[in-house]
């Protein structure tokens, strides 16, 4: 992968656009056809950690393939095969829930962490996907406070992404729970709205809204 990606160019383009930090590098889910197939894919996923290191990102984020009868077995085997390949890398893997994927519910994370104890593997919270799936996200945070490495901040009406502060999700509650566990990671805004032409304005409004929420909960503005 590092042969195919011009990392220096990506960094320069990000700087030209005014971006100052890369909070995560996103990668493909492990294949789920068989345990052997997932294990064989570990080497390619390990390359993501080198890309992330060069990008200055602390995290690699992946989700799961669509839910099938094969269950989480192949994905867990793939992660286990990945860990020895990244043991000298300080970066961490933060598993994100996706609506309809095999990583979605509280029980999915429970099954993963029953077999994988490494602190190098944790959770990306995603308020939108949790809302779509009806997940008890507070219980997940309470169960795994030290494994919460990342937060994708979304607001939704039903399964549809909407601008932050205009939907049904208790984002204030998320900030309260994260503050209570001492979370210091990213608040990564995601907007998958039906009117993408308005994204520049929605991003500006999201920044103001999030700063307000953080100030309201913690008493100080975030950096």
What are these regions (language model features)?
Residues 1-3, 166:
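Generic detector of contiguous secondary-structure segments
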Residues 1, 26-29, 64-67, 96-100, ...:
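Active-site beta-loop-alpha junctions enriched in small/polar residues
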Residues 21-22, 149:
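A short, local hydrophobic-aromatic micro-motif
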Residues 13-20, 30-123, 132, 201:
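Active-site acidic/histidine proton-transfer and metal-coordination neighborhood
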Residues 7-17, 78-85, 139-143, 173-177:
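Catalytic-core regions built around general acid/base machinery
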Residues 4, 8, 39-42, 204:
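Generic alpha-helical scaffold signal
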Residues 56, 106-125, 130-223:
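Histidine-acidic metal/acid-base catalytic patches
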